[in-house]
UniProtKB/Swiss-Prot annotation:
InterPro entries: Syd (IPR009948), Syd_sf (IPR038228)
Keywords, sorted A to Z: Cell inner membrane, Cell membrane, Membrane
Protein purpose: Interacts with the SecY protein in vivo. May bind preferentially to an uncomplexed state of SecY, thus functioning either as a chelating agent for excess SecY in the cell or as a regulatory factor that negatively controls the translocase function.
Pfam families in the cross-refs: Syd
Designated name of the protein: Protein Syd
Taxonomic lineage from the root: Bacteria, Pseudomonadati, Pseudomonadota, Gammaproteobacteria, Alteromonadales
GO cellular component: cytoplasmic side of plasma membrane
Location of the protein in the cell: Cell inner membrane
Membrane topology, from the record: Peripheral membrane protein
Length: 216
């Protein structure tokens, strides 16, 4: 079962929740990065938050290059989850706590995402662990949300360790269990690390990555 219908519905509900509760669209700090998502004027030199809406991509994002580089087949949901929209990361409440789902802000962001997924998969190979790929963060960024590449199930994972808790048998069922979390935008501070340039959620991945490197 594709995760796309569940993702479509969640993104629609996400913006409707902000409009119903706050009377405005969700806002995001793009840190100078343009996007088709941005509503209204955009000044690349400004550090102000922007209002945004998800935008369907005209040309779908593909992970065929990642599959070719690593000589493996990725679970098909990765193309639906990351390749259908340009959007900001989205916040959620769930039976397992609060968290954030990663999305792709622009084409350069998609390229950076692919680099990070390659890095994550190479780390799993180095540790001789089954392949997973990340979709977001749980509990203030202390835990990653990952998809088991063998069967598409969703798990809690701490970098360097095996996935610890299965949350849902599929990405679609996981997304269906989420509800939008309404919160003001947060301006994330970037840590200096090559090839990890995504504003926001990648800052949390960087912190976890530094914690992992410190253990090795």
């Amino acid at each position: 079962m594709s995760c796309l219908p569940a993702l479509d519905k969640f993104l629609q509900n996400y913006h409707q929740s902000y409009l119903s509760t706050l009377g405005e669209l969700p806002r995001y700090y793009p840190q100078g990065e343009p996007s088709l998502c941005i509503q209204g004027e955009f000044d690349e030199s400004s550090d102000e938050a922007v209002s945004w809406l998800p935008v369907k991509r005209e040309q779908l994002g593909s992970f065929a290059n990642v599959e070719h580089a690593l000589e493996l087949t990725l679970w098909p949901d990765i193309n639906h989850f990351y390749g259908e929209y340009f959007a900001a990361p989205v916040l959620f409440d769930s039976p397992w706590g609060t968290g954030e789902l990663l999305q792709v802000w622009n084409e350069a962001d998609f390229d950076a995402l692919q680099q990070n997924i390659i890095g994550h998969l190479m780390m799993k190979q180095k540790l001789k662990q089954p392949a997973t790929w990340f979709i977001g963060l749980l509990d203030e960024g202390d835990k990653m949300l990952t998809v088991d590449n063998a069967d598409g199930s969703v798990w809690v994972e701490i970098p360097g360790e095996l996935p610890s808790t299965q949350l849902a048998p599929s990405l679609a069922e996981f997304i269906e269990a989420l509800s939008p979390r309404i919160a003001p935008p947060v301006k994330h501070e970037e840590l200096p690390m090559p090839a990890l340039e995504h504003p926001g959620i990648f800052a949390s991945f960087k912190r976890m990555w530094h914690n992992l490197i410190g253990k090795r």
